UniProtKB/Swiss-Prot annotation:
Motif ('Ionic lock' involved in activated form stabilization): 134-136
Site (Plays an important role in the conformation switch to the active conformation): 113
Organism of derivation: Dicentrarchus labrax
Name of the protein described by the UniProt record: Rhodopsin
Keyword Transmembrane: yes
Length: 353
């Protein structure tokens, strides 16, 4: 084995010289330089600095403007809540531990950080699935006369929380476990060991199948069908400039959604799966740290993609920030007026909200 396994930890370094210590008790500067830990701390501070205001603003603007309190926006708010879970439950803890060079908060702190980070990430992921399914049902109309109402939104919210808890809770109760990973200053699911009594193998397979592959397939199926529907509507009305504009806007949105999803989760999932299938092989501490920390950026670009691309929300946000006046109101109004009125696909049913 090219690492050192101990009670509730796995350090990716063989303890041939006797320098490896528990990441709960001692700084891990023998893995990488102190400057690397300082850089991680600064990175987490930047994510907090960006992630908290934009997600809090999302909640505040929606509460302040009654016209934003629509069923679909409940799911978007759920996405912001998930990101705030990650910011407060995960990012602040990771910044603090990075500044110390080890997981100074101990085993309990590791469980809490791993739980909140996983919960927030999973709520966000399944919220995107619900959004994708809603867009597919409304735009492609596999069920005639379907309207996404408040009851559907509540069921969608409940679904995201149930699925998130079904992934984040088991490691707390003995099906797998949370341990420090990478540079040992953040915690995640144990992909590294076959710890007796924790059934890590079955949980990791369950997690990848039910909480990565399935949601990814659903998202790309739904938005693939959405794109086809928009193209069909545009082809049926070749001379409609507004329909062509709708096609372009939706195409851009779909491409951004797909790329963001892959960029956020595929590196982390791929590295985690590699480590799981090559347990005992040699890999450095940075190997898992980089994709794990990069995946955390979803708390920043999730609201940018799924909320700030909403023209109505952007108008309300500017109004809130400018004390009740929108200096770009004329431009926003012209943009809103240009929304497509195509019978098959309207921009109100194609836009993110």
């Amino acid at each position: 084995m090219n690492g050192t396994e101990g009670p509730f930890f796995y350090v990716p370094m063989v303890n041939t010289t006797g320098i490896v210590r528990s990441p709960y008790d001692y700084p891990q500067y023998y893995l990488v330089s102190p400057a690397a830990y300082a850089a991680l701390g600064a990175y987490m501070f930047l994510l907090i600095l960006l992630g908290f205001p934009i997600n809090f603003l999302t909640l505040y603007v929606t509460i302040e403007h009654k016209k934003l309190r629509t069923p679909l926006n409940y799911i978007l708010l759920n996405l912001a809540v998930a990101d705030l879970f990650m910011v407060f439950g995960g990012f602040t803890t990771t910044m603090y531990t990075s500044m110390h060079g080890y997981f100074v908060l101990g085993r309990l702190g590791c469980n809490m950080e791993g739980f909140f980070a996983t919960l927030g990430g999973e709520i966000g992921l399944w919220s995107l699935v619900v959004l994708a399914v809603e867009r597919w049902l409304v735009v492609c109309k596999p069920i005639s006369n379907f309207r996404f109402g408040e009851n559907h939104a509540i069921m969608g919210l409940a679904f995201t929380w149930v699925m998130a808890c079904s992934c984040a809770v088991p490691p707390l109760v003995g099906w797998s476990r949370y341990i420090p990973e990478g540079m040992q200053c953040s915690c995640g699911v144990d992909y590294y060991t076959r710890a007796e009594g924790f059934n890590n193998e079955s949980f990791v397979i369950y997690m990848f199948a039910c909480h990565f592959i399935i949601p990814m397939c659903v998202v790309f199926f739904c938005y693939g069908r959405l794109l086809c529907a928009v193209k069909e509507a545009a082809a049926a009305q070749q001379e409609s400039e507004t329909t062509q504009r709708a096609e372009k806007e939706v195409t851009r949105m779909v491409v951004i959604m797909g790329i963001a999803f892959l960029i956020c989760w595929c590196p982390y999932a791929s590295v985690a799966w590699y480590i799981f299938t090559h347990q005992g092989s040699e890999f450095g501490p940075v190997f898992m740290t980089l994709p794990a920390f990069f995946a955390k950026t979803s708390s920043v670009y999730n609201p940018l993609i799924y909320i700030l691309m909403n023209k109505q929300f952007r108008h309300c946000m500017i109004t809130t920030l400018c004390c009740g006046k929108n200096p770009f109101e004329e431009e926003e109004g012209a943009s809103t007026a240009s929304k497509t009125e195509a019978s098959s696909v309207s921009s109100s049913s194609v836009s993110p909200a």
